[in-house]
């Protein structure tokens, strides 16, 4: 990532020098007032976004998303207020950018040559590709010529110019558009067999697979491309330079790494059987215990407490292990006595004690650990003991890392099982690799509960407002959309 940012800065510096030779800045200033100065004068940064489960959304804990967190940090960097303006699709967003209604377009947008001719490129912070998806179990297409039906895509999608370009070499390629469904909803329609194919961005597909595991990737429609911000083409490049400076700062301070860890890391592991079992349990078992998770959640979201319990026992209050731990939260006898519970197989007693014990551990974590990361430290301590957590913090410091940065700490957890490392630590050997996987699993389970609930709520709303998909798809592909 650092190399990518450095190359972008060098490239843009050369570009700006060449542009200055051809078209003096004074002419630009006469044509339009400096966009960067406009932002500073109004003390507001206007960023256009599209509601999206990874980029921008309003959840139980407030506004969140990759683009939101980056934009919020950039506004703070400029010492201005952030004003989010939302649009239904990329087409509307770019229209607003062209009409000076927003200063930046940030919506998980991939680099496209066509767009780079119309707008300035702001910054790149991860990469992704467009992929064709189908339902697992049906015939897999390996290339465009093997599609046995139309692609269904949202109206105004950023993939439209790509499809139009691909059609030049694939004249039989056809697609239909719909105004009624988002890209995420179309992925779910594929999973349910209601439509044959759609196209999505690779990270979005990975996220969708954790709530509908029968979504499968047929093939890559494009190579990986940078995901970046777009800026008005007519603006003086001081805004562009500010964006690049900020992204370089965000990379050096670890902000980008922390955001990627938060939104992407749990997507790396995909186990079809495990996810199928988990989703079945969410529907059939979780409702029995949801009220208890809500009652004893403390400072946690109840979904997080539920995810911990699933990792511990798969929501089985009678679960046992050869090591002697028992119950929904798999408590040891000593912990049960310490938390004053009399029956470890009581779901309520176990959930209460597990939550109280986790909160107790989190209170003992140094205050220098950021609030948003304390839960991960607490979970590691819950799994392997507070002493070993303190050991891995010391080890992280010895190895030149930051003990208050979860990314630095978690990569050192497996080292607690290596003699050359644990022999010099106060609490000695620990199965740190298990603690590492324990935390990763809980993050994945937590995310799946959140997304499953959101999708279920959206589908209920759609069922109330809309009829079936085939009647709502607009067959415009061979006329206005593909000239």
From Swiss-Prot:
It is found in: Cell outer membrane. Its main location: membrane. Residues 19-267 are annotated as: Non-LT domain. CDD domains: MLTF-like, PBP2_YfhD_N. Residues 473-483 have a biased composition (Basic and acidic residues). It catalyses: Exolytic cleavage of the (1->4)-beta-glycosidic linkage between N-acetylmuramic acid (MurNAc) and N-acetylglucosamine (GlcNAc) residues in peptidoglycan, from either the reducing or the non-reducing ends of the peptidoglycan chains, with concomitant formation of a 1,6-anhydrobond in the MurNAc residue. Keywords: Cell outer membrane, Cell wall biogenesis/degradation, Lyase, Membrane, Signal. GO terms for cellular component: cell outer membrane. Murein-degrading enzyme that degrades murein glycan strands and insoluble, high-molecular weight murein sacculi, with the concomitant formation of a 1,6-anhydromuramoyl product. Lytic transglycosylases (LTs) play an integral role in the metabolism of the peptidoglycan (PG) sacculus. Their lytic action creates space within the PG sacculus to allow for its expansion as well as for the insertion of various structures such as secretion systems and flagella. The N-terminal domain does not have lytic activity and probably modulates enzymatic activity. The C-terminal domain is the catalytic active domain. This is Membrane-bound lytic murein transglycosylase F. It comes from Actinobacillus pleuropneumoniae serotype 7 (strain AP76).
